[in-house]
Amino acid sequence: MKAAEIREKFLKFFESKGHTIVRSSSLVPGNDPTLMFTNSGMVQFKDVFLGTDPRPYSRATTAQRSVRAGGKHNDLENVGYTARHHTFFEMLGNFSFGDYFKHDAIKFAWELLTTVYQLPKDKLWVTVYQEDDEAYDIWAKEVGVPTERIIRIGDNKGARYASDNFWTMGDTGPCGPCTEIFYDHGPDVWGGPPGSPEEDGDRYIEIWNLVFMQFNRDAQGNMTRLPKQSVDTGMGLERLAAVLQHVHSNYEIDLFQNLIKAAARVTEISDLTNNSLKVIADHIRACSFLIVDGVIPGNEGRGYVLRRIVRRAIRHGYKLGRKGAFFHKLVADLVAEMGTAYPELKEAEQRVTDVLRQEEERFFETIEHGMSILEAALADVEAKGGKVLDGELAFKLHDTYGFPLDLTADVCRERGMTVDEPAFDDAMARQREQARAAGKFKATQGLEYSGAKTTFHGYEEIAFDDAKVVALYVDGSAVNEVKAGQDAVVVLDHTPFYAESGGQVGDQGVLANAATRFAVADTLKVQADVIGHHGTLEQGTLKVGDVLRAEIDAQRRARTQRNHSATHLMHKALREVLGAHVQQKGSLVDADKTRFDFAHNAPMTDDEIRRVEQIVNDEILANAPGIVRVMPYDEAVKGGAMALFGEKYGDEVRVLDLGFSRELCGGTHVHRTGDIGLFKIVVEGGVAAGIRRVEAITGDNAVRYVQELDARVNEAAAALKAQPSELTQRIAQVQEQVKSLEKELGALKSKLASSQGDELAQQAVEIGGVYVLAATLDGADAKTLRETVDKLKDKLKSAAIVLAAVEGGKVSLIAGVTPDASKKVKAGELVNFVAQQVGGKGGGRPDMAQAGGTEPANLPGALAGVKGWVEERL
């Protein structure tokens, strides 16, 4: 039975038992910031179990894509070396939310395994929690499992309820016993049943875990029964497939065998048992699905984990002899295996391929040099009888050549060595400290404040008349008074000033009364609800308790608002034009422009840029109102509001409807889209692999930009004696004229070189049957020098030639050697002999090489030495 059929039978079985088939959630958890990746089937149902996310069903079943390669759950280092470790796996599960409990859960599992999958009953063993008599009796008395194959497992992890058969969500909260089902591979495989000293062997393999959420544990450790008891089960598809396909390693199942064969094809390896092929086959699954879910290779967080996995796969390909990009070629094979079950993979095939190819090409630029350094260091350690690689060197490989620590550790392990990880960590810490010392940080963090929060009025007002000073800070310390000329941070009880957040810069403006004037240069958060006004006291003395008029720079705010609102419209337009994979990765909105970074793996075409501009300007012309609502986060997301990747949101969120855009946003915005005026993209480029950046301007800035562009067009048209409407045609005519003249000039240069070549041939000196010539060719470019050398070689038959030209204070050199002489006189060595004397270097083939230099004054002497240099080698 193939893996695809196993998956389908599982889902269909539970659907027949009244379960709703729920599609796999993203590998990036949307409801649990503590998790790096979705690592089990229950993650998407966590809030359902907690009662905060009501669903229209009480029974569910899933095939959940899962990754264990970061944070607490990290299987990366074992992948490829064991039979059952993977970075990516599929977790089959069925769930009951206050519906059925132990009886049905156990009976469903037994029926599926023994009737649908037809596993022999005498091959199945089960474990239960020591005190779970109910589960024990169901297995023994109702299902009929012999008691010798039912094993009670107690608190075997050193604490009360710390057991392989007791599940907890955390230190407090829902928890309960679990029962696990094991498959016995038979006496030919070493190992003992669970709970025995030999349980780590491969004979008895856990295939299904049924968790019974029965209790709630409080902070004192007290257990109370949950009013609604639930079930969470998980069974690894790959493990089950190995059992049903009668193999002992997950890598022997059909799905993996097809990927391993594909990996062998692209790496040109015939030995299908090579562990590196297993690594590559595993990693293409994790990498592809992470990219499908919006993760891009990067230097931190999820992006760095993805980069580590990609580079580990590349390193194993390199180990097999691949010196160029190969990994991305496996995406099509993965789509063939899993694209039907997961159509999102098929839809994103080209994007996944492009992202992986770019990451490969980037790493292949450094891997060879890095590997040579690592291999030399390991050889040195071995020669000295050591077993530990210096952590400082491992850090250099990480910092300079992009080698993740686990990649270096992987190579070391293959040689029976380890890495000095504490030394690596020390080096990393030093670098971070240096970076902190070198950077300039705004003085908002670390200010000690324990007063009331600031009330923000900036959504409605640009000024507030009776703002009271509640705290003052100078150089990071709280003070009671600030004097004229001092820089300070002012905290008010009420303010219209927006504090930098969500990509929007903080407001500027003035705090003043009859005797005092404080110029606000920036506004930043001291705490989540406390706003700090950063600036300089220009007049008077400012004390805690003073009352001021707080007024923002209204013109600057208006420009910033236009840019911020345009960013929302642009984000939506980018998704319409480029695809739903577009995700915001960063932004900066100020009075001058909006800068927007987003996930996309190719430069935008001119047509795509024009389409985005058109869509945004159409929304501006529609003059739609901006509608703001405050609502619970879950309600907002269900209503279609876009939650931005990496942003933190509270229980209550601010939702902005602006034209066709709906986003969660706490920033300030225009009242109607027409207030934006005009939208123009001025910059599009790449900032990292898979990340593009767009800069755009609005309003009067956009009008001014278009006017300046129009003026330049008119100037160019006048210079070419054409009307602006004819400019493109006139430029094409001029380009044709230039091309024709360049061709004519090239012909004249060749003709001149030919005539000079005849003269130069007469200057050649014969040494040992080889004609040697070193001369300057006035007015020649590199192409002319090469052509002249070729003609001289043909004319002289046996020769070693160096020709030079000087232009703009720079020397161009070409050396040519005929085949009969190139065994003793190499053109690359000859040209370098001259180049080093004129402040340069070069290289090339034994018969033709070129170089440059910056010291033309030394050229005559350098050319004069050629005859002697050649004579020594003949």
UniProtKB/Swiss-Prot annotation:
Q: Which UniProt keywords apply?
A: Aminoacyl-tRNA synthetase, ATP-binding, Cytoplasm, Ligase, Metal-binding, Nucleotide-binding, Protein biosynthesis, RNA-binding, tRNA-binding, Zinc
Query: Which CDD domains does the UniProt record give?
Result: AlaRS_core
Can you state which reaction this protein catalyses? tRNA(Ala) + L-alanine + ATP = L-alanyl-tRNA(Ala) + AMP + diphosphate
Where in the cell is the protein located? Cytoplasm
- Entry keyword Aminoacyl-tRNA synthetase: yes
Q: MF terms per GO, please?
A: alanine-tRNA ligase activity; aminoacyl-tRNA deacylase activity; ATP binding; tRNA binding; zinc ion binding
Q: What Pfam family does this protein match (any one)?
A: tRNA-synt_2c
Q: What class of enzyme is it?
A: ligase
Q: Which residues bind Zn(2+)?
A: H564, H568, C665, H669
User: Which EC number(s) does UniProt give?
Assistant: 6.1.1.7
On whether Protein biosynthesis is a keyword of this UniProt record, the answer is: yes
Query: Which branch of life, at top level?
Result: Bacteria
For this protein, the record's HAMAP family field holds: Ala_tRNA_synth_B
Q: Would you tell me the protein name for this molecule?
A: Alanine--tRNA ligase
The source organism is: Burkholderia orbicola (strain MC0-3)
